[in-house]
Amino acid sequence: MYKPKIICLLLGILSGLVFAPTFFIPALLTLSYLCYIVQKSENWQEATKFGYLFGFGHFLSGIYWISIGVSVYIADFWWAIPFALFGLPIVLACFISASCTLSFFAKNNKYYQFIFCLCWVLFEWVRSWIFTGLPWNLIGYAFSFSDILIQPLSIIGIYGLSFIVIYISTSAYPLFSKQFTQLKILLASSVLVLTIIVIYGAVRLSNNHTNFTDIKVRLVQPSIPQTEKWNEEEFWHNLMLHINLSENLEPTDLIIWSEAALVVPDDIPQVKSKLLKMLNSTNAILITGGISDNKKQGDEFELYSAMYALDKNNHKLFEYHKSHLVPFGEYMPLKKILPFKKLTHGLIDYKEGNGGLVYLEKYNLKIKPLICYESIFPDFVRTNNEIADVIINITNDAWYGKSSGPYQHFHISRSRAVENGLPMIRVANNGISAIVDPFGRTIKKLNLNEINGTQGLIPKKLISPTIFSQFGNFTILLLIVFILLINYLLALILDHQRV
């Protein structure tokens, strides 16, 4: 059985290419082989091994770029590179392995393929919250290359779209065992489901043009290398680069800088002077990422990754503290056991904020703030967003260089706009900055490594909230019933034709 194991590993590596930026969609068919080999396994232990090898390859090629982030400070963290490159796939492979183990026990069920899809999505959901969660590269994001194909997110969310993708991708599995009747049913139902998605997405986009508010926003992307971002000698150069990019465009209402754009407190006199000069010359409000603390001393001192707004009168209009922190990056879990420092600058761990919305009174703008990878958590973004007008996502993807990471992050983030029917303003230090409408369409964009600013009007949110934003993942139950009904009807039709 070594040959199937090697095949599973290689196909897993190939399957990781279905995500941004390659979007090699034919690789989704690798899942048909996995579905087949799990069913043909002699015991659950063998099915577990097949799933694990596939999962290891899947995450190895899909999130290899995390090791690039670790290598930024290679002198201090050289030892962590193998853990980032191989250790994370070793852990994450357990979720695909577990889904295969569970599926094996339904190998003789006539709805085996359907159960396989359910198990896959179940463990994607588990992966989104266990051990703080990492719902990166859920299989549904393979469809994010197309504005049309991601429109179902407004109804069924990313887990529902994952179910559709995995269902279509495994529809060819009876081919390996020459079960041609079942193959006809699954292929026919997959074509029908895909056709419905395409029609729904195309009609939804063609019938809904982007409507805009009167609020002008400027996105500033300085693309500062991570090695220079916290360098004291580069501080004034970096600050002036932000300011020059902010001033060198038409008049605007809001200027948005990226995550931790201000690496020092904004009340330092020389810094404050330059910020106020910029804000007075542009007559704009600055929304920026920065570092904040609770103004206490000793053991009570707490440090936060923050997003806040400043006006030309030096008033802080709101302040948001990041509530979903990156383990090992922004804090060290099990710090009493693991004698290591966090990856990001500084010796002190960041503390969690409270999340929630912020309000910009001047423009009557209710904002759902998201810092960095908070945007990858669909349930977190959906929480308390029913009165929000816009999502503002600031990030710093300079860690990952010219790799798959920044592209994947962008497409994952814009999916939240479609799910919630909200426009998204996304600003990266380096990465992909964009204005995205509530249908996920990119209105303005700055590409990876581009040093520039761009601006436009903030799109309006949808008049009515999306079905997903109201009911969340419960809509997946309707999807399951719908696809089961399609399968049942197609089976009846084929039986009637044989008679």
Swiss-Prot record:
It is found in: Cell inner membrane. Gene3D superfamilies: Carbon-nitrogen hydrolase. The keyword Acyltransferase applies. Belongs to the CN hydrolase family. Apolipoprotein N-acyltransferase subfamily. This is Apolipoprotein N-acyltransferase. Its main location: membrane. The active site is at E259, K322, C372. It holds the Pfam family CN_hydrolase. Its EC number is 2.3.1.269. The keyword Ribonucleoprotein does not apply. Keywords: Acyltransferase, Cell inner membrane, Cell membrane, Membrane, Transferase, Transmembrane, Transmembrane helix. The chain crosses the membrane at residues 6-26, 50-70, 77-97, 114-134, 148-168, 183-203, 474-494. One of its GO terms (biological process) is lipoprotein biosynthetic process. CDD domains: ALP_N-acyl_transferase. Catalyzes the phospholipid dependent N-acylation of the N-terminal cysteine of apolipoprotein, the last step in lipoprotein maturation. Residues 220-465 form the CN hydrolase domain.
